[in-house]
Design a protein with these regions (language model features):
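Loop-to-helix entry region at the N-terminal start of transmembrane alpha-helices
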Residues: 1-9, 125-130, 229-246, 304-333
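Periplasmic/extracellular loop-to-transmembrane helix junction in inner-membrane transport proteins
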Residues: 69-132, 151-170, 186-247, 269, ...
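C-terminal transmembrane helix and the adjacent membrane-cytosol boundary/short C-terminal tail
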Residues: 339-343, 347, 354, 381, ...
């Protein structure tokens, strides 16, 4: 129903654009006055006044309608004798009533559920009809108001710009609030985790085995349980594995991607560039699970057989295989961005270098690269963030074992992989095992924030030097 209403409001609003534009022209001719804005702004004015109030009302109604209906139905059920000891019992009864209404309840339907479901259907119908009527009245009222303003030859452009600025502000506010919501959701769950697990045991522990955590209530934890948990949530193997695989990926992606970008920007002919650049960027569109299959079925076994020929013990799920494939996946990001920033370097800098008889390679090395360095650092930063956040390739190619190792031929794991594995399936959100995923997320967020800050400082330093 809501989608249908949004569709109708949108279609009707945009049709009013043409009416508002023609109406302003006809009023100008009839009353012999000059419009205070272009006719199209009167069309925009009518569109905004028709759509925004009704859409805002629909949003507010949609947010509060379920809560109001739920409180009404639970009150009716309680009056009919439903026993609700706590909120969980009330929620269970309400879900049963909804299931009976939707026809998806397969248990015994007693008179209480039947009557409550009929009441639910009744109030659902009342609320739906009321919503349609109120939205219709809001649309009509808004159109009447907007037409009166148009007839008075208002400054429609100023009004439209004020409304659009308000929409831009709301969009920015939504982005900020979303970020704060993510931070606080991680923070609150992490606080619950650290009320059971000592933060120093977490940060400096060298063993990660969350499957050993069975404690739910931090207030009732015993000394034996605490000692068991103390060695279950060590963060060091995860951050070491994440950094190790990301380092291998960067050792592959940075030189190949940067040299590819330099070649495409400075040496490649238009014909080669027209063919090669799309082929390189195809890599960016391949799903990561495909890279994971390639690493697990081809690259991993290849390294294992190659190592056996040299007398080395190589795991079929190794950090080297995961890092290599991850580096190949990241190459297009560095290559494309490096190409763009190198092409953005002013030609006058190159001409000045050539004027003092510098060669092309000397110009690239001494002039172009330093001038493009902030953008290159930005592309590398994007690649590092991509490598740190990658999950599927590591799951399929590097394994799940949290080994603390610097041997690229051994299996290891990353932070994001462990977050996924912890939250797979139906988990209890009051256990340290599940809450550890939020602690990992918060730690990764802080580490990425520090990395971004350092990178921004470096970019700012070099930009001031070469601008």
């Amino acid at each position: 129903m809501n989608l249908a209403l949004i569709f109708l409001i949108t279609i009707f609003s945009f049709s009013l654009f043409f009416y508002g534009r023609s109406k302003s022209k006809s009023l100008s001719i009839e009353n012999n006055y000059k419009l205070k804005a272009l006719p199209k702004f009167y069309g925009y004015y009518l569109v905004l006044w028709c759509s925004l109030p009704s859409l805002v009302f629909l949003l507010v109604w949609t947010l509060f309608e379920p809560t109001i209906i739920k409180s009404i139905i639970l009150k009716i059920a309680a009056d009919q004798g439903a026993i609700m000891q706590d909120q969980n019992a009330a929620n269970l009864i309400y879900e049963k009533i909804k299931a009976v209404y939707l026809g998806t309840y397969f248990g015994d339907i007693d008179s209480l559920l039947k009557e409550s479901a009929l009441s639910y259907a009744k109030f659902k119908n009342i609320f739906t009809n009321s919503k349609i009527v109120l939205i219709f009245l809001i649309v009509i009222s808004s159109i009447i108001y907007a037409l009166k303003k148009i007839k008075s030859n208002n400054k429609a452009r100023d009004d439209v710009e004020i409304i659009l600025k308000g929409l831009l502000f709301v969009s920015s506010l939504i982005a900020i609030l979303t970020t704060l919501g993510i931070i606080f959701s991680l923070l609150f769950e992490s606080i619950k985790f650290f009320s059971v697990i000592n933060i120093f045991d977490y940060l400096f522990g060298t063993n990660w085995s969350p499957q050993r955590a069975f404690v739910r209530d931090a207030s009732s934890i015993t000394a034996a349980e605490y000692e068991d948990l103390k060695d279950a949530f060590g963060f060091v193997p995860l951050i070491a594995g994440t950094a190790f695989i990301a380092l291998i990926a960067m050792l592959v992606a940075v030189p190949v991607g940067l040299f590819s970008g330099i070649y495409m920007a400075e040496y490649a002919t238009k014909k080669i560039r027209r063919v090669s650049k799309p082929i390189i960027e195809i890599l960016a569109g391949i799903p990561t699970v495909v890279y994971g299959f390639f690493a697990a079925l081809t690259v991993g076994p290849f390294f294992r057989e190659l190592g056996e020929n040299f007398g080395l013990t190589v795991s079929s799920e190794s950090a080297l295989a995961a890092g290599l494939i991850m580096g190949i996946m990241i190459i297009p990001y560095i290559s494309s961005l490096s190409d763009d920033v190198i092409n953005s370097v002013p030609q006058s800098l190159r001409d000045g270098s050539y004027a003092i008889r510098a060669t092309k390679s000397e110009t690239i090395k001494k002039v172009v690269i330093p001038a493009a360095l902030p953008g290159i650092i930005g592309s590398v930063l994007l690649a590092v963030s991509r490598a740190i956040g990658e999950t599927m390739i590591v799951v399929m190619a590097a394994g799940l074992a949290a080994n603390l190792t610097i041997n690229p031929l051994d299996s290891t794991t990353t932070i994001t992989t462990q977050i996924v594995m912890i939250l797979i399936g139906d988990q209890e959100f009051d256990s340290p095992k599940t809450q550890s995923a939020f602690a990992l997320g918060l730690t990764l967020f802080i580490a990425t924030l520090i990395l971004n800050y350092i990178a921004l400082r470096v970019v700012k330093k070099y930009r001031e030097k070469y601008d």
